[in-house]
Amino acid sequence: MGLTNETIQSKLTEKFGDQLTAFETTYGMLSFEAPKELNLKVLNFLYDDDTLQFRFLTDLTGLHYPAQTGRELAVVYHLHNMTDNIRIRFKVFTGINQPDIYTATGLFSAANWMERETYDFFGINFVGHPNLKRILNVDEMDYFPLRKEFPLEDQTRIDKDDEMFGRG
């Protein structure tokens, strides 16, 4: 019998108790949230557990939720168990004033580039990263372009009507 979302959630709850929250399954993929201080412990458990075996980091990215005071920035991990062909997603949140998350590069070498990209676009500082610097934008850039701090369109344009896009 293959690995199921119920088994994954049960093992995570058994290990971490109520520290992991917001469990939900969307389109067959289990998602949950973890405190940022636990990101490495959760990743290591998912990787090392003989049943879970989430040994492939599919993606790591950032998100900006400006309305969530104290947890404005999120890091989202997508992991894949190749043996049972099952994927999961989990998020850790941090405040925008001190956006520190522990690096996953010690466990997944692929996290190196993904964390640099996330730093470059969202300003999330990956503590312990071996080479955390901009990777796509110029070094002189003094802002993080994917934060929702900028208008979607040039406000002086008259050829676009925001009402047509549900923003008016």
Give residue spans per PLM region.
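Terminal low-complexity/charged segments
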Residues: 1-168
